[in-house]
């Protein structure tokens, strides 16, 4: 039996999703910072993957899972890691079919979920083949290294992408807790993994944006839609039974301060953030302040700073999605994804507040960002020119964002051929 991994607060990435009616251009936009883990830095490059370069049999470098792939992949462009020791790690990409993905946003699920559905981790071989007690290697599931390679070149819409990813998760499992973004010119879907084999997905409403800062963030889920028309929700086939069988729906989450929060389940709706997610001191230092700052910028007329503010940097109930006050521009995205609490007492580069407050919370723009990729899928231009990848390589506060067409046969050599040196 694969033992549950300990719940940890993710140490990388910030995601901002913009529905087509919420964006200034009328396009869907998915943006994510890919941040290296503490103590390392992962440089990136930009490459076009031809169908002939796509493997037909895939083996993960990290988990050693092996998967046969379809024989009809399409061309796609990705911004993967340069260092080869951790596999492809495509991170963000768009296909010639105008489907885009960003993977992954590290999230955390609670111990109750992991006990009920443990992560599927690689178990190395033990002993010597042919001798007593030998136990062969057991591969792990799929993870950030694999997801875009296994999904993006085989789907024609965001919905198809969710379905394919869900099938892979249910069959092979996963060894880590992740959020995955899949979009097309009309829709944005956000998938969160629940334990080793379960998952939920929610569509971002067209007139809304969504903020995800390394937490399991979806705060409403409608089972009647997920098992009906699937207009806004999808999930693994046995999710409802899984929740009931392991009493997860009875979960009460510690409220901020003292006492307990409200019950998680109400008829056909659950709050996944309560049922599956975490609420810890680490979340309030590392995660919730980033959601607070993004929404503070996009809904500025609300009270965010007074003692009576509805949401504070440590609020657990900051909405997963909401309508912005004004249409969101690429400039807004660039600012937010490189931001460091400008205009607040929490800016580490600022002069407001105190030395303590300026280092209290984890900002979005940090020095271990490998790149920010915002993929804009436009509906008012020819399909061949619809996908634009806005990319900033390196630490956001000190770099500039530049646009690149994604539907290409090749990429500039100075971005394609980046070496570890």
What label would you give each PLM region?
Residues 137-138, 151, 363:
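Hydrophobic alpha-helical scaffolding
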Residues 148-155:
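Short, well-ordered beta-strand elements within core beta-sheets of diverse protein domains
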Residues 277-355, 362-364:
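Accessory, solvent-exposed terminal regions and/or long lumenal/extracellular loops of proteins
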Residues 341-421:
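Substrate-recognition/cap regions that form aromatic- and gly/pro-loop-enriched pockets
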Residues 8-144, 164-307:
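A contiguous strand-loop segment
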């Amino acid at each position: 039996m694969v033992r549950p991994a300990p719940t940890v607060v993710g140490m990388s990435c910030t995601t901002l999703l913009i529905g087509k009616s919420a964006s200034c251009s009328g396009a869907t936009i998915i943006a994510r910072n890919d941040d290296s883990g503490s103590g390392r830095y992962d440089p990136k490059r930009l490459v076009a993957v031809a169908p002939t370069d796509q493997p037909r049999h895939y083996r993960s470098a990290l988990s050693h899972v092996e998967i046969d792939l379809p024989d009809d992949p399409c061309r796609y462009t990705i911004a993967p890691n340069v260092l080869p020791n951790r596999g492809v790690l495509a991170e963000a990409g768009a296909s010639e079919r105008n489907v885009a993905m960003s993977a992954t946003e590290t999230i955390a699920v609670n111990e109750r979920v992991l006990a009920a559905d443990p992560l599927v981790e690689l178990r190395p071989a033990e002993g010597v083949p042919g001798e007593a007690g030998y136990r062969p290697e057991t591969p792990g599931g799929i993870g950030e290294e694999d997801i875009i390679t296994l999904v993006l070149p085989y789907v024609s819409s965001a919905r198809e992408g969710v379905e394919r990813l869900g099938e892979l998760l249910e069959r092979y499992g996963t060894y880590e807790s992740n959020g995955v973004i899949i979009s097309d010119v009309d829709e944005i879907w956000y998938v969160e993994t629940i334990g080793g084999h379960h998952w939920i997905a929610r569509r971002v409403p067209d007139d809304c944006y969504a903020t995800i800062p390394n937490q399991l963030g979806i705060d409403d889920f409608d089972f009647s839609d997920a098992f009906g028309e699937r207009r806004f929700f999808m999930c693994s086939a046995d999710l409802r039974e899984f929740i009931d069988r392991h009493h997860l729906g009875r979960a009460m989450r510690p409220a901020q301060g003292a006492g307990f929060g409200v019950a998680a389940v109400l008829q056909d709706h659950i709050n996944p953030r309560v049922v599956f997610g975490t609420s810890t001191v680490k979340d309030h230092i590392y995660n919730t302040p980033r959601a607070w700052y993004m929404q503070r910028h996009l809904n500025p007329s609300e009270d965010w700073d007074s003692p009576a503010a509805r949401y504070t940097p440590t609020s657990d109930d900051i909405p997963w999605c909401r309508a912005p006050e004004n249409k969101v521009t690429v400039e807004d995205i660039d600012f937010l994804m490189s931001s460091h609490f400008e205009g607040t007492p929490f800016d580490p580069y600022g002069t407001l507040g105190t030395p303590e407050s300026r280092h209290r919370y984890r900002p979005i723009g940090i020095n271990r960002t490998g790149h920010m990729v915002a993929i804009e899928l436009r509906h008012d231009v020819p399909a061949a020119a619809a996908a634009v990848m806005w990319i900033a390589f390196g630490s956001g506060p000190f770099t500039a964002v530049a646009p690149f067409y994604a539907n290409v046969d090749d990429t500039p050599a100075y971005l394609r051929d980046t070496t570890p040196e």
